[in-house]
């Protein structure tokens, strides 16, 4: 893979196509070790759950994951309305000195964490109007993804399966439809369980993959982070290389017979 093959979001290019969350680790030191092993450049942070300066008497994630070394992606995990999500990202912009690249998620159900798309669309419209560059967690509905792009989202992030489920890529066909129609990056968000899931997403043509539980919840998070790095890179290279068509039978022998020396009688 050449250095020219980069992920570009909102005008900024990244060498890594793996985005990693910062929740569920043992401590901030393990978080940093996993991020380093993953090779990620974009790190997502749940503003409602992680201290990035709003609690000055507590350890801050920014001491371990400084904005000078990573692109921070504030997210609205835990928000169930457009209003809550917008307020949360306004706070993030204030805490991060005007940072405007954000990840929007508006949840609809606390049990399955499925996105509430009407509220998501409403929040996207407001945030774009306020100058945010919005990456949006959404369903794998191509129509909804097109609506988000039309509203000004800089990336759409359809779920592969439920958040934290580890179920992998359940509907590759919808993902392909979204990829084929989109002029903004398409990143799988939620549901990745192991390295092969990440590779499949990339082989389908996704521009990137975001994950948290698959790494933080592994028996060895640092080793899994390394595995995910290789899977994303390998899946991307396979997509660029182009797989052979699937066929029930080979159309011709894999070893051609033309030009072979005839057996001596």
Swiss-Prot record:
Official protein name in the record: Thiazole synthase
Presence of keyword Translocase: no
Keywords: Cytoplasm, Schiff base, Thiamine biosynthesis, Transferase
Record-linked Gene3D superfamilies: Aldolase class I
Species this chain originates from: Bordetella bronchiseptica (strain ATCC BAA-588 / NCTC 13252 / RB50)
Reaction it catalyzes: [ThiS sulfur-carrier protein]-C-terminal-Gly-aminoethanethioate + 2-iminoacetate + 1-deoxy-D-xylulose 5-phosphate = [ThiS sulfur-carrier protein]-C-terminal Gly-Gly + 2-[(2R,5Z)-2-carboxy-4-methylthiazol-5(2H)-ylidene]ethyl phosphate + 2 H2O + H(+)
SUPFAM superfamilies reported in the protein's UniProt record: ThiG-like
GO molecular function: thiazole synthase activity
Biological process according to GO: thiamine diphosphate biosynthetic process
One annotated Gene Ontology cellular component of this protein: cytoplasm
Chief place of localization: cytoplasm
Function of the molecule: Catalyzes the rearrangement of 1-deoxy-D-xylulose 5-phosphate (DXP) to produce the thiazole phosphate moiety of thiamine. Sulfur is provided by the thiocarboxylate moiety of the carrier protein ThiS. In vitro, sulfur can be provided by H(2)S.
Cellular localisation: Cytoplasm
Pathway listed: Cofactor biosynthesis; thiamine diphosphate biosynthesis
Enzyme Commission numbers on file: 2.8.1.10
Active site: 103 (schiff-base intermediate with dxp)
